[in-house]
Amino acid sequence: MAMILVADDSETILLLMRTRLEMAGHTVETAADGQEVLDHVADGVVPDMLLLDAMMPRKSGIDALRELRNAGWEVPVLIVSAHQNPGDADAPTDLEIDGYITKPIDFDRLLETVAELTA
């Protein structure tokens, strides 16, 4: 199974995502914002996939993804957002984004998408 780095500023959502992903057999690292994502990567965490909240304090998931893509990272990415329709702020066209999940999270759909992207 995959090692997934999950970032969200809601502790509840992080706990739910960690629990559901681990129940599906994945290893999960969590971050409270985009800066923590970058810190994990700098500390040697090498995820098979990123699951990033679009909007977080300090550094958004989009900003963290932009930095990782500019550094050559090619891992699959799912963006999570409270917005029902992805706009440029949530899913900018200049970044390679593999999927978009809306809140409230449909965990069955999330797990299906993760399985497809990490197969």
Predicted regions and their residues:
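The feature encodes the CheY-like receiver
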Residues: 56-58, 85
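Short amphipathic alpha-helix used as the core "switch/output" element in two-component signaling
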Residues: 39, 62-73
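Charged docking surfaces used in two-component/phosphorelay signaling
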Residues: 15-23
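Acidic catalytic/metal-coordinating carboxylates
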Residues: 32-36, 60-63
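Active-site beta3 strand of CheY-like receiver
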Residues: 45-51
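Alpha4 helix (beta4-alpha4-beta5 surface) of REC/receiver domains from two-component response regulators
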Residues: 63, 84-101, 112
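C-terminal output helix
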Residues: 105-114
